[in-house]
Each structure stands twice: as structure tokens, then as C-alpha cells.
Amino acid sequence: YDIERAGIHSYRYRTKNPMHLLEKIIRKRKENYAKFEHINKSNYHKYITDLIGIRVFFLYREDWIHFHKFITSMFENDPNNYVEDRLRDFDEDPEHCYIAERPKVYKRSGDTRIYDSTQIEVRTGGYYRSLHYIIKYHGYYLEIQGRTLFEEGWSEIDHDIVYPYYKDDEMLTEFSGLLNRLSGMA
């Protein structure tokens, strides 16, 4: 497989900012204490699945299948490896690289039905659109997200303007929803 056959137009990557990591740990522990009760400085990498984030961009949503075939050819995709308990199920072998959760796609209600639910878990509802793959890679989890360039553009604007400050602004929320629907047409 090469990057073009995988349907990838471009990509970005980042490592999690330490302050954002700390905020996320505090938030997660507050939201679900039982699940995150034992998280600490020596095991947080077993809980946090996006210490490293890679976002790939497609021109067309239909390109998802090419990327899915690419990623499942690069990493073992065995449901027996899917992590349920972050501490118990963590594979300590740093050389064992695999898909650690069932691949998911978040789509909006009304989106065309291009996803094959036998290959990827389909979650519908809300405005969020993205493919998600959690990969165990050399002792750490990394998250790979995939979306179209249009979906990324809308998401960046929404996250920059609406999300942090104006979630309750009816006009901005309506405008953001319109942009979301338009981005989904590509």
C-alpha cells in the first residue's frame, strides 16, 4: 500500500500537550472514577489513547474504505486484542503493534450509508464526523482519525468559534449546523 492508494490526501500529527494531558486525566477521573481510579504517573499511558494523534484527510468520504484496508493491513485487527480493562488488558510487549479497539466511525444522522458495519462500528447522532482507530504501537496507544478536508475545515471553525465561547448562541449554533451539513456533502 502507498499513501495514494490508501485514499490519503494529507495528514497532521501531534503529541498531547502536558497541560491538556493533566486536564484530561482530571476530567476523566471526575466523570468515571471507577474506571480511572488507579491511574497514576507510572501507568497513565495505559489509559490515555491519544498521547499521539494522527489525523488523515480524504477528498471524499468514500475514500474511507481504502484507508481502512490500508490500516488493517499494517496492524493486526483481532477482536481478541481489543482492550476493555486498561490495566488488565494492556499488552506489555512493546513489539506487539495492533488495533486496540474496534474501529469506529462517528457520523451525523442523515449521512449517506457508505460505511460497512461488519468492518467498522457505526455511531450516529450529533454533529461530529470522524473515523477513529486506536493503535497500540511500541508500548503506547495512538489515535488515528480520518475525515474529509471539508469536515476538517468545518470542525476547526466550529471548535475555534462556537465550542469554547458560544455554545448557547442560537444563531452561531444554527450557522455551524449548516456548515456541518454542507461539509458532509463532499
Predicted regions and their residues:
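Surface-exposed, low-hydrophobicity interaction/linker segments
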Residues: 1-37, 94-97
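Residue-level detector of functional hotspots within protein domains
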Residues: 7, 40-42, 117-119
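Surface-exposed peri-terminal alpha-helical interaction modules
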Residues: 32-33, 37, 41, 45, ...
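Long beta-strand-rich cores associated with HINT superfamily self-processing modules
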Residues: 45-47, 52-53, 57-186
